[in-house]
Design a protein with these regions (language model features):
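Bacterial N-terminal signal peptides that target proteins for export
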Residues: 3-16
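Bacterial N-terminal signal peptides
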Residues: 15-24
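Sec-dependent signal peptide cleavage junction
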Residues: 23-35
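N-terminal substrate-binding region of glycoside hydrolase catalytic domains
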Residues: 35-229, 336-371, 375-388
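Short catalytic/ligand-binding loop motif for oxyanion handling, primarily in non-cytosolic enzymes
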Residues: 95-96, 129-138, 260-266, 304-307, ...
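Active-site cleft segment of glycoside hydrolase catalytic domains centered on the general acid/base Glu
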Residues: 188, 195, 200-251, 255-287, ...
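Substrate-binding cleft/loops of secretory-pathway carbohydrate-active enzymes
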Residues: 255-292, 297-343
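Extracellular/luminal regions of secreted and cell-surface proteins that mediate adhesion/ECM remodeling
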Residues: 398-532
Length: 532
């Protein structure tokens, strides 16, 4: 290497305030271990990133087979959000229409298209959808007990119609019910009364029904959630689902949906079906039995006010909250703002998922809820092309989950044979921790992409704190040591950085100059060549 020198490639990287690398083999070169002679300033490039175990998920099926897949443009996989997970909330009866005969292709055929593009899938198999059948009726025929419900319409003095779901009594009359779906416009009233959402494939053969026909009149039979026959059949379903999906790396999460309205763990519209704490725990245990690898999520309504918070946390079950923007009596126009109190019990160790109401007028409310609840996942629970969502999606994407940002890297002199001391500053500018963690890693790479030296920091990005709304993320400092080889051929060389989770996974970072398809980013460059 005698008679050769390293020269800086001036202006190679925008945003490098100072990258004055030491010229090798010159007198005085190679300062002390803490003599950081090179300072590299880095900036968040504001890119919209996807990363493992976080981000947007799109509701392809929302309890029924009609929303929101019918709004999705053909061939669009929502890369511009970016959305990397498609979510199926679908009635059990669609997947197991006959006992032991599974129609997995109903969702898998769609899922395969997304997986082929490097995306993920997620599920919530629903037992109860108020108004339409979700439990296959062969469960009832096998002896399970439950309650038949039907909707009735009551006209109000202002001309609106309020729909009330009531249990059908043994004598054919309707019992007391709870108000739901107030102030629907007239065209929606006719649809709700005469067509409904038809969640059952064999629902009245697709024909309109008449008032008083309680078996078909936009109602449903709801199983008792502690019924032993039901639990046996449901366990068989979960066993089959676990065998199919638990070892599939493309499955992002499974939401627990086997009790309560829409699988949300509450019985607001089906109060004749009680849900005890012991019943809830039994359902949780069944999911845990058959899903040992996939992240499980539970709705906040299923655990609120119970000792099940501790049970779910101890067993690694994350929190899902579907309340954002949901209107309520006497509340503000933007509706509910997210269950911050319960999210605070989970987010430091487990992911939080938020779902907004299917209206999208108040997307600022959604953004604030994501920040306040420190959400990892956010659902696109609407037509993905509505203007109000388009205005906020980029801002949400830059905040949702974790966002690992290097602000400065400092090094000692870099030359052949040097033991380069590296110090760096990082923040997590996202809303949630990077739960799986990872280690900042530095590389010496030549122009052909060959790695000549690697330095793995002991610093773990899992330890980066996240800020509350209105506050700045705390910067933390880590170190690494990069041993430069004694001999380097004439070439251009790059100092690159990445954050590595495991041998197969590195994170996307908001930096320019990515090293090919790898998650390595060039932050400085120099050449080895003959003296001029």
């Amino acid at each position: 290497m005698g008679g050769k020198t390293n020269k800086i490639l001036k202006g190679a990287f925008a945003g490098l305030v100072s990258a004055v690398l030491c010229l090798p083999l010159m007198a005085g070169c190679g300062g002390g271990a803490a003599d950081y002679t090179n300072v590299i300033k880095l900036q968040d490039n504001q890119a919209l990133l996807t990363n493992p175990d976080m981000g947007f998920n799109f509701t392809y099926y929302a309890n029924t087979i009609y929303d929101f897949n019918n709004t999705l443009h053909p061939g669009d996989y929502l890369d511009d959000f970016p959305c990397d997970t498609i979510f199926f909330r679908i009635g059990w009866n669609w997947i197991e229409p006959e006992e032991g005969k599974f129609n997995w292709e109903f969702t898998d055929d769609i899922a395969d298209e997304w997986i082929a593009r490097g995306k993920n899938i997620a599920f919530c198999w629903v037992v109860t959808y108020p108004g339409d059948q979700s439990t296959p009726l062969w469960v009832k025929e096998a002896g399970a007990e439950g309650v038949q419900y039907a909707y009735t319409a009551e006209s109000q003095t202002d001309g609106s119609v309020e729909y009330i779901m009531k249990p059908v009594m043994e004598d054919g009359t309707l019992g007391a019910g709870d108000q739901r779906f107030s102030n629907l416009p007239k065209d929606a009233q006719d649809y709700a009364l005469n067509r409904g959402n038809r969640n059952d494939p064999a629902y009245n053969n697709g024909e309109e029904v008449t008032e008083g026909d309680y078996e078909n009149y936009r109602g449903s039979w709801v199983v008792n959630y502690d019924d032993p026959v039901f639990l046996e059949k449901w366990e068989n379903f979960l066993k089959a689902a676990g065998e199919r999906y638990d070892d599939n790396p493309a499955v992002q999460f499974v939401e627990i949906g086997s009790f309560g309205d829409w699988g949300e763990g509450h019985n607001t519209n089906t109060r004749a079906n009680s849900i005890s704490q012991s019943t809830k725990r039994k359902h949780f245990e069944l999911y845990l039995k058959y899903f040992e690898n996939v992240q499980l999520m539970v709705n906040d309504d299923a655990i609120e006010g119970t000792e099940l918070v501790s049970f779910t946390k101890e067993n690694g079950i994350g929190l899902s909250d579907h309340s954002v923007q949901v209107p309520y009596a006497g509340g503000p126009a933007e509706g509910m703002t997210g269950n911050v109190a319960y999210a605070s019990l989970y987010w430091r160790d487990l992911p939080v998922l938020l779902e907004h109401h299917n209206g999208t007028t108040f997307m600022e409310t959604y953004y604030n809820a994501i920040v306040d609840c420190h959400a990892t996942f956010a659902r696109i629970n609407c037509d993905p092309y509505v203007a109000s969502l388009s205005e906020w999606k980029d801002m949400i994407a830059r905040k949702l989950g974790y966002r690992l940002v290097f602000s400065e890297v400092r090094t000692t002199d870099i030359y052949a044979g040097a033991e380069v001391q590296i110090q760096f500053d990082m923040t997590n500018e996202g809303s949630a921790p990077c739960y799986a963690g990872g280690n900042p890693t530095f590389y010496l790479v030549d122009s052909l992409g060959r790695v000549h030296a690697t330095a793995v920091s002991e610093f773990n990005v899992r330890d980066l704190s996240v800020a509350d709304r209105g506050e700045e993320a705390e910067s933390m400092t880590g170190t690494a040591v990069l041993q430069i080889p004694d001999a380097l051929i004439d070439d251009d060389y790059y100092i690159c950085v990445s954050v590595v989770r495991d041998e197969n996974t590195s994170y996307n970072l908001p930096l320019d100059y990515q090293d090919g398809t790898r998650q390595r980013y060039q932050i400085a460059t120099f050449t080895v060549g003959a003296d001029e």
